[in-house]
Amino acid sequence: MQRSVHELLTPRTIDVKESSATRAKVTLEPLERGFGHTLGSALRRILLSSMPGCAVTEAQIDGVLHEYSAIEGVQEDVIEILLNLKGVAVKMNGRDDAELTLSKKGPGVVTAGDIKLDHDVEIANPEHVICHLSENGEVNMRLRVARGRGYEPADQRGLDEDETRAIGRLQLDATFSPVRRVAYAVESARVEQRTDLDKLVIDLETNGTIDPEEAIRRAATILQQQLAVFVDFDHEKEPERVEEEEEIDPILLRPVDDLELTVRSANCLKAENIYYIGDLIQRTEVELLKTPNLGKKSLTEIKDVLASRGLSLGMRLDNWPPASLRGDDRVLGG
């Protein structure tokens, strides 16, 4: 293999071995020495802390005012029920929140599969146990599901709603990340005569709302988006605001020669860097009278010519000079 000593290897092989619908090992090779840990650590952090997903964030249980309660006929206390609700793997399609209900009478086991779902909401682990009911036990609850990212403690959510939140609306710490566990290992790899290369092996498990391969793909996309700014530092700059200029009356863009003034008056104006009609109308009578060789007779001539075109001296143009004339040094007084 002919390769410049300055050229870094890029991975050529990616292998995905799924041991189940929720667990897989992803192998990436070859990598330059050290890149296995660099990429493995970054992807692991993103997979655990930054992946978007859905979770139960609030529960209302009939007859329960706070989490330190107990429900007659239910084996678990409310705190245990809330902990079990955190383990429900929810997936929403095309929406950011949902209100779900769960009602069941005993005896029996209450599972995630007993939750009544909307058409665009799925439960990936319907067998997940929520609580156990005795013969006379009954449970009725309303659950709020929301979309988020990573982990969100209940005390950091909706602080502005605390005063209006009804008693009995129990808040849950939410683990939105669909990734349950991630581990990575770096092994030795070989390419022809080189034996100092890395092979990255990522072992991950999800909650079933996303397959492991897609989880890796999303994590890599997040990492790519975060690093993109370093590829082109122009991305750091805020887009320049292009201010829309008001339409300029075309007559103002015409040279003063078009006014057909006397040679004396025209030469006096050019001596003061007044080349366009737009320049002229912004001057006052006092300013023009200070122009060498321009007397009251010439001033009257200029005023009359401008008046015949519906213009006058002392007018104000906020957007002058326009972009079309900014390259003309004469307009800038050059």
UniProtKB/Swiss-Prot annotation:
The N-terminal domain is essential for RNAP assembly and basal transcription, whereas the C-terminal domain is involved in interaction with transcriptional regulators and with upstream promoter elements. It catalyses: RNA(n) + a ribonucleoside 5'-triphosphate = RNA(n+1) + diphosphate. Residues 248-334 are annotated as: Alpha C-terminal domain (alpha-CTD). GO terms for cellular component: cytoplasm; DNA-directed RNA polymerase complex. Belongs to the RNA polymerase alpha chain family. Keywords: DNA-directed RNA polymerase, Nucleotidyltransferase, Transcription, Transferase. It holds the Pfam family RNA_pol_A_bac. NCBIfam families: PRK05182.1-2, PRK05182.2-5, rpoA. This is DNA-directed RNA polymerase subunit alpha. It comes from Marinobacter nauticus (strain ATCC 700491 / DSM 11845 / VT8) (Marinobacter aquaeolei). Its EC number is 2.7.7.6. The keyword Nucleotidyltransferase applies. It is an enzyme of class 2 (transferase). Homodimer. The RNAP catalytic core consists of 2 alpha, 1 beta, 1 beta' and 1 omega subunit. When a sigma factor is associated with the core the holoenzyme is formed, which can initiate transcription. DNA-dependent RNA polymerase catalyzes the transcription of DNA into RNA using the four ribonucleoside triphosphates as substrates. Residues 1-234 are annotated as: Alpha N-terminal domain (alpha-NTD). One of its GO terms (molecular function) is DNA-directed RNA polymerase activity. The keyword Ribosomal protein does not apply.
